[in-house]
């Protein structure tokens, strides 16, 4: 399409990549995927006390086609996993995923066959946010960490290779239904 795909990443485009990273990090459009108590804390982040609008994210998108950040807040059941994957596939590129809470990150205290033991078995996760549930300040810190990561992301072909590698790692992971936990 443009010059960023014709030249290798970082060649003659460092200032353009820096500008593009600055613009991308300031215009994230989150799609909330709230499934449990973490969703309440995520909604509190949009309130006046914590004011997520400071970072350009005042409106959570209802459609995945309008979002580039998915915040998975809470536990994901095996039946919900295909829906999560479908929503991720419908999001626009470049896209990022934030696993909010210990349930989204590792299954939490639900170590059974019905709960996915980590969202990273379904979609590639960029930021893991621990806590049960994590406080709104922690979510804001995770978003700022994601901003730093976006600022450093290269443009063009190399970015697509990194995304493909993360996707393959997520697909190659052991299915959660076959995992053996502490109680099995």
UniProtKB/Swiss-Prot annotation:
Keyword Membrane on entry: yes
Topology versus the membrane: Peripheral membrane protein
Xref: Gene3D superfamilies: 3.40.50.12280
EC number: 7.1.1.-
Subcellular location: Cell membrane
Catalytic activity: a quinone + NADH + 5 H(+)(in) = a quinol + NAD(+) + 4 H(+)(out)
Cofactor list: [4Fe-4S] cluster
Keyword annotations of the record: 4Fe-4S, Cell membrane, Iron, Iron-sulfur, Membrane, Metal-binding, NAD, Quinone, Translocase, Transport
GO BP terms: aerobic respiration; electron transport coupled proton transport
An example Gene Ontology CC term for this record: plasma membrane
InterPro entries named among the record's database cross-references: NADH_UbQ_OxRdtase-like_20kDa, NADH_UQ_OxRdtase_20Kd_su
Binding site for [4Fe-4S] cluster: 37-38, 103, 132
Cofactor, how bound (note): Binds 1 [4Fe-4S] cluster.
GO molecular function: 4 iron, 4 sulfur cluster binding; iron ion binding; NADH dehydrogenase (ubiquinone) activity; NADH:ubiquinone reductase (non-electrogenic) activity; quinone binding
Domain of life assignment: Bacteria
Keyword 4Fe-4S tagged: yes
Functional description taken from the UniProt entry: NDH-1 shuttles electrons from NADH, via FMN and iron-sulfur (Fe-S) centers, to quinones in the respiratory chain. The immediate electron acceptor for the enzyme in this species is believed to be a menaquinone. Couples the redox reaction to proton translocation (for every two electrons transferred, four hydrogen ions are translocated across the cytoplasmic membrane), and thus conserves the redox energy in a proton gradient.
UniProt family annotation: Belongs to the complex I 20 kDa subunit family.
Subunit structure comment from the entry: NDH-1 is composed of 14 different subunits. Subunits NuoB, C, D, E, F, and G constitute the peripheral sector of the complex.
Annotated protein name in UniProt: NADH-quinone oxidoreductase subunit B
Species, as recorded: Rhodococcus jostii (strain RHA1)
GN (gene name): nuoB
């Amino acid at each position: 399409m443009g010059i960023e795909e014709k030249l290798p990443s970082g060649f003659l485009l460092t200032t353009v990549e820096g500008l593009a990273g600055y613009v991308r990090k300031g215009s994230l459009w989150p799609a909330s995927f709230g499934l449990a108590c973490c969703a309440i804390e995520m909604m509190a982040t949009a309130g006046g006390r914590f004011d997520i609008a400071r970072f350009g994210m005042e409106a959570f998108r209802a459609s995945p086609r309008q979002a580039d950040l998915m915040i998975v807040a809470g536990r994901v059941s095996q039946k919900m996993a295909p829906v999560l994957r479908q929503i991720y596939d419908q999001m626009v590129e470049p896209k990022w995923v934030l696993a909010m809470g210990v349930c989204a990150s590792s299954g939490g205290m639900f170590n059974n066959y019905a709960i996915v033991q980590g969202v990273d078995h379904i979609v590639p996760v960029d930021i893991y946010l621990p806590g049960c549930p994590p406080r709104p300040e922690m979510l804001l810190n995770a978003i700022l960490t994601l901003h730093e990561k976006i600022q450093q992301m290269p443009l063009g072909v190399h970015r697509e290779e990194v995304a493909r590698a993360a996707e393959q790692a997520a697909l190659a992971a052991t299915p959660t239904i076959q995992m053996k936990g502490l109680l099995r």
